[in-house]
Amino acid sequence: MTDLPYPEYECWFLTGSQHLYGEDVLSAVARQSQAIVEALNAAGLPVRLVWKPVLTDATGIRRMCSEASATDACIGVIAWMHTFSPAKAWINGLLALRKPLLHLHTQANLTLPWSTIDMDFMNLNQAAHGDREFGYVAARLAIPRKIVTGHFSDPDVVRDIAAWQRAAAGLADLRSTRLVRFGDTMRNVAVTDGDRVEAQIRLGSAIETYGVHDLGVRVDAVAESDVDALVDRYLADYDMAPELTIGGARHESLRYAAKLELALRSFLHDGRFTAFTTNFEDLGPLRQLPGIAVQRLMADGFGFGAEGDWKTALLVRAVKTMSRGLPGGTSFMEDYTYHLEPSGRLVLGAHMLEVCPTLTSATPRCEIHPLLMGGREDPVRLVFTADPAPAVIVGLCDMGDRLRLVANTADLVAPPEPLPRLPVARAVWQPHPELKTAATAWIAAGGPHHTALSTAVSAREIRDFARMAGLELVLIDEHTALDAALDRLWAIEQTRASRPW
């Protein structure tokens, strides 16, 4: 099924029952669970569901869960107790399971046949309490899981499963992600630092560091013919500032920007890296801070973090993977400054250069402007304004004893006025529930100033991702009440291990 967004992945559908009811019932369970899988696949799930034979005993369950854990293509398991499946049989299997779990609380029939219902029907269709038995053991074992309730034909059920699958795809990709840091983090900045060993333990991502001189060698080795081809692509794809066109006064700067992109692409490809960071304080032999190169690489799905921010680079990569095939975009972002007019408080988000063009449906303009930081030549960048759309803004921070996700839903809006003198790509948004509550809660949670902003996924995928990755989540949305949020954060702080100071 190569038309799926994730043809390389699959999720397994496990049905629980027992031999108490006889072979005819087990045959019916198998037929009906297969029909559910076929219906869900036909409903447009992003990851193919694979039906597995009905499970009736502890040995079979443990083997199936162990097999799922050992199968790279399997990124998650959906469990459903069609009849009553005594949950002690699931204990060892659930303890062996190392893949995300979704508990689907559904049944084969949409309605009850009131006039003909008998005990044969009742014995076959008893997920109402069979799933409660399974739920008890999952809760007793504290298994991270998502519970979806409703008939499998319900569009809301399909959307919930699809969101969970997308989160599972993001986590599966992250567990094989290799990230390269070109240089270290920005000097004296706290939130971009962190425990890279803990991140690999928790998320599975390998984080490696190379000197910027290694990238500089690649830049020097780029063939001029390859630069010619990429420059032609730039000229065709973007509204080019006249000074950057062939024969223009700054055309050589565009050619050097193309060299940076080609060098970065080859380095990432050869090292099997799918995320990377740069740092304007550590540019070595590079003549420009990479701008258009980073923007185009993000547009192709690479994760990125500025100033050595590897946590945000991993997060951008994960969210881009979750959003594969969806409208909208995902980008590295930074809350830059506020519009505090009481009638409409807004955030203006941007960065020096590096905002992903997937956030706009317009043709970006390719420009060159001075950059005060870095002490290098003026960098080439794409300039645009993000399209109005619902969005979620997510940050990942190291709290010392755990990793925390902080997320805020928002509405991207058009700027109240044009921005003719702002030489960078940008987004303007109204955070939920409003700026005062959102910013106060974000700061109280220790949320970072670098984030992944997405108009493609929602808080639903982020919540599922946090749970399956074992990350603490602080979600700020339209339902957030400030005092309650602050009280919850303070209560969390009181449960942390005692500090040495």
Swiss-Prot record:
Q: Which InterPro entries match?
A: Ara_Isoase_C, AraA_central, AraA_N, AraA_N_sf, Fuc/Ara_isomerase_C, Fucose_isomerase_N/cen_sf, Lara_isomerase
- Keywords assigned by UniProt? Arabinose catabolism, Carbohydrate metabolism, Isomerase, Manganese, Metal-binding
Q: What EC number(s) does this enzyme carry? A: 5.3.1.4
Q: Which reaction does it catalyse?
A: beta-L-arabinopyranose = L-ribulose
Pathway where this protein functions? Carbohydrate degradation; L-arabinose degradation via L-ribulose; D-xylulose 5-phosphate from L-arabinose (bacterial route): step 1/3
* UniProt GO molecular function: L-arabinose isomerase activity; manganese ion binding
Q: What does this protein do?
A: Catalyzes the conversion of L-arabinose to L-ribulose.
What name does UniProt use for this protein?
A: L-arabinose isomerase
